[in-house]
Amino acid sequence: MAELKGTFYGVSVGPGDPELLTLQAVRLIRQCPVLAAPRTSSGRMLALDIARRALGEELDGKTILPLQFAMSRDRDVLRASHEAAAAAVRPFLDAGQDVAMLNLGDVSVYATFGYLQRLLEAEGYPTAMAAGVPSFCAAAARLNRPLTGGMDAPLTIAPGGWDDRVLDTPGTKVLMKNGTQLPALFEKLAASGKLAGSALVCSCGLPDEAVYPDLSLDRPEGPAGYFATVLVKE
């Protein structure tokens, strides 16, 4: 009889505010003996920090597995990074232990979980996803404004490095993970008459959160951090 393998869960923890964790996320974090989380080059594990703020001492005694992901556009470098992370997770799954990989925002939106999910599923490991609150929804709530109007109003979501034509699409535009490009973006918004009414939320729900409700009145002078979300609404 084949040994049962553990399940690899992608668990969304939201953008920063621990109150935005879903009941499902809390249950899975409690249930899984192993918690995997991305670790930045500076050693920060933001997704784990959010879970710890929500569950506190309940995480004591769990195995914490830091995952290092390369920040590169080189496909070979990225592939090696993903394979190394999958290799770190695999022994726990082989031992029959469930692993919860904690992801900022929602696990289905520009999340590193998807890379490992594909690799591990191809090897026969079971996987599952727990939905959460994406950063742009939390940013809209923080600004106290809806993302869309009527049912016919389109919504465009684009990550950093988008094509400039995105700004010409109708409806609301959500520009994510674009902190280093903010000065150039502000110039383009001003030139197209879209700066007034556009908003920026940096590090939504985190201790260093910054909110700019109207970029025509107030905006940062230089680049911002990675977790910057710009809402352009017409």
In which residue ranges do the predicted regions lie?
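Short, surface-exposed amphipathic charged segments that create phosphate/polyanion-binding patches used
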Residues: V77-A85, R142-R145, T169-T172, V211-L217
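Structural signal for conserved beta-strand scaffold positions within catalytic alpha/beta enzyme cores
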Residues: A37, T63-Q68, M129, G149, ...
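Short gly/pro/ser/thr-enriched loop/turn and capping motifs at secondary-structure boundaries
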Residues: S42-R44, S72, P134-A138, L206-D208
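A contiguous loop/helix-start segment that scaffolds small-molecule binding in enzyme catalytic cores
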Residues: F8, V99, L167-E234
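Class I SAM-dependent methyltransferase SAM-binding "motif I" and its flanking Rossmann-like core
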Residues: G105-T169, E221
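Class I S-adenosyl-L-methionine
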Residues: M1-E19, L23-P126, P220, G225-T229, ...
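A generic local structural motif
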Residues: L20-Q24, A86-A87, R142-N144, P159-D163, ...
